[in-house]
Regions:
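Conserved nucleotide-binding/hydrolysis micro-motifs of P-loop NTPases
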Residues: 52-55, 70, 156-158, 215-217, ...
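Charge-lined substrate channels and their catalytic hotspots, especially those that engage the 3′ end
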Residues: 1-150, 157-202, 234, 532-534, ...
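Conserved catalytic alpha/beta cores of large enzymes that bind or transform nucleotide phosphates
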Residues: 176-271
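Append "with occasional cross-activation on large, charged helical scaffolds in nucleic-acid assemblies
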Residues: 224, 237-507, 514-516, 521-532, ...
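Hydrophobic residues embedded in beta-strands of well-ordered beta-sheets
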Residues: 15-18, 147-149, 219, 291-293, ...
């Protein structure tokens, strides 16, 4: 009974109303007196808060907090997902107002205090639908064998002061949320898409890490400074990728140099035992009403890796700058992004599972050896039917990456020190890191670790909640996409086994549905959890994770974001 707010559809009767909802959240409907409807009508999708749950009553009593709209309407459904997780879908007026009051023009005095990169070649590379440009890269040649690469990050904390109304809202949200068709920004849009966004041909304030690298991408020097930049161009990943592939186009010589350095950084990282999880993202082509017309997959290519490698380098450098202190000295309290070593039992389970596909990994030995054997497994399954599945189970084997003041290193990236510094427009921990960095660069004393740890925990929790909401929004679109395909037959692969049914992922569009166990009526099936399979008592027929199957789409339930399949 910890959760007090629920989303559902209102059923209004003569003297009272009920909130009817998906039972996975609460088994009992919520009783709502008619004077607590807050303008909501019969059939509306609403957010309700439980006010009391009388001792003897079956149903809790609630009141309508917000009317979301009519079920089935795209915005209503997206807001419903956010509301169900307790996430915001509107900006408080006072926060918007505070953002409007921030002056657009950068003070000349401020510019004078900073290192000026406005005449240095600088670009941003981002997804084509992005508006919040957090990061830019600059390049200049220092000598025949030496390059200077600047990683320039939007100086958000110059505009958002600790404890002000914008800051409190951002701290609470902790992250921007990327639903399937919209972004719920952590900061008001005037900041996220305007003042702080590193838009081309505009002077922008940054917090930067400047590297000197030789042609082998060995770092000769690095420094952390406040800067002012003026980006020459905003490229999409697709445009940058075309330049990398063809060697032609605007700024091709600079992009090719940066790409070559990034590739070398990447090779070194994997040689040190970083793990290469390259998952594709499922994306939808939506019409103007938000209806899904088609599914496509977004893959990471060299242009993505180019940005990724320099961001990883900057994050690592900042974490080392604060965390790496001489023996016997105490590092000041800081926010790390940590990723613990996988649990050895989980590695054994993964090993047992992949054995049936003829693969194996090292589960003992030092962490670099284990990581390398996981990489070689991920390489081997590329393009094979079990690819997605083995990757999924391998990811589940890993610990979760979280924020913490207690540094244990980052296993997946093979870094001893790592933090999040490069995305302050969309992640609050990065804003915390910017503030700590500024304080410590100025010689300030350490902040209180206990308080910082609490903020880290809040950010980790919110990151997880946002990820769940993002997943739900994709799930909703998948069900909506399949709703007019009832009766169609598809090839798929068993993606989950439970005692209530078999989950199957369709190969061509990655939509997942379930064959309820009652549909398997040729036998009585029992779950063999250890081996990820269902086994028929009589026939010994089995359904196991990773097995190819043909299914027919039987039902699409949008309200529950569920697809039901039957065997074809």
């Amino acid at each position: 009974r910890a959760q007090t707010r629920f989303v559902g559809v209102l059923e209004v009767q003569k003297y009272f109303a009920f909130l009817v909802m998906d039972s996975k959240f609460l088994a009992n409907d919520i009783f709502i007196p008619t004077d607590e409807l807050n303008g909501a009508g019969n059939g509306d999708k609403v957010l309700v808060e439980i006010v009391e749950w009388p001792e003897k009553a079956n149903n809790p009593v609630g009141k309508v907090i917000d009317v979301l709209g009519k079920p089935g309407d795209n915005t209503t459904e997206m807001h419903a997902i956010l509301a169900q997780y307790g996430l915001p879908y509107r900006y408080p007026g006072d926060v918007e107002k505070a953002a409007e009051l921030i002056p657009e023009k950068i003070d000349e005095k401020e510019i004078a205090l900073r290192e000026d990169f406005r005449d240095v070649f600088t670009i941003t590379i981002d997804p084509k639908d992005a508006k919040d440009f957090d990061d830019a890269l600059s390049l200049r040649k220092i000598s025949p064998t030496l390059w200077e690469v600047g990683v320039h990050i939007a100086d958000v904390t110059h505009y958002v002061r600790q404890g002000d109304v914008i800051d409190k809202e951002a701290e609470n949200r902790a992250t921007s949320i990327y639903l399937v068709d919209r972004t719920i920004p952590m900061l008001p849009e005037r900041l996220s898409n305007g003042l702080c966004s590193l838009r081309p041909k505009e002077d922008k304030l940054c917090f930067s890490v400047i590297f000197e690298l030789n042609e082998y991408a060995e770092i000769k020097k690095s420094r952390i400074v406040r800067t002012v930049i003026n980006s020459d161009s905003r490229l999409t990943y697709e445009e940058a990728q075309t330049v990398i592939e063809t060697g032609k186009g605007d700024f091709s010589s600079e992009i090719l140099v940066m790409n070559s350095l990034a590739q070398k950084l990447r090779e070194k990282r994997f040689a040190n035992g970083a793990i290469n999880f390259e998952r594709y993202e499922v994306k939808f082509n939506l019409d103007e009403k938000g209806k899904p017309l088609g599914v496509y997959f977004k893959e990471s290519k060299e242009a993505n890796h180019l940005i990724e490698e320099f961001m990883l380098l900057a994050n690592r450098t900042v974490a080392e700058f604060i965390g790496k202190v001489p023996k016997g000295k105490h590092a000041k309290a800081f926010v790390y992004r940590i990723h613990d070593i996988p649990d050895s039992e989980k590695l054994d389970t993964l090993n047992a599972f992949i054995l049936r596909f003829g693969h194996k990994i090292k589960t003992e030995g030092n962490k670099v050896e284990v990581a390398k054997s996981i990489n070689s497994l991920l390489d081997k399954v590329q393009g094979r039917p079990e690819e997605n599945l083995v990757e999924t189970i391998a990811i589940r084997t890993m610990s979760k990456a979280v924020y913490s003041t207690k540094n244990v290193g980052h296993y997946g990236l093979a870094f001893d020190y790592y933090t999040h510094f490069t995305s302050p427009i969309r992640r609050y921990p990065d804003m915390m890191v910017h503030r700590l960095l500024e304080r410590y660069l100025d010689g300030g004393r350490s902040v209180d670790q206990t308080e910082l740890e609490m903020e880290c925990k809040h950010s980790s929790d919110m990151e997880q909640v946002a990820a769940n909401a993002e997943r739900d929004s994709i799930k909703y679109k998948q069900v909506e996409f399949m709703a007019d395909k009832i009766g169609k037959v598809y090839d798929g692969v068993v993606s989950g086994i439970t005692e209530w049914g078999i989950y199957v992922e369709i190969n061509e569009n990655k939509c997942e549905g379930m064959i309820p166990i009652r549909e398997l009526d040729d036998d009585f099936y029992e779950l063999d959890e250890k081996n990820y399979r269902l086994v028929g008592r009589r026939t010994k027929r089995e359904y196991r994770l990773g097995q190819p199957v043909s299914i027919q789409v039987a039902k699409a339930n949008l309200e529950r974001k569920q697809l039901d399949f039957v065997l074809a």
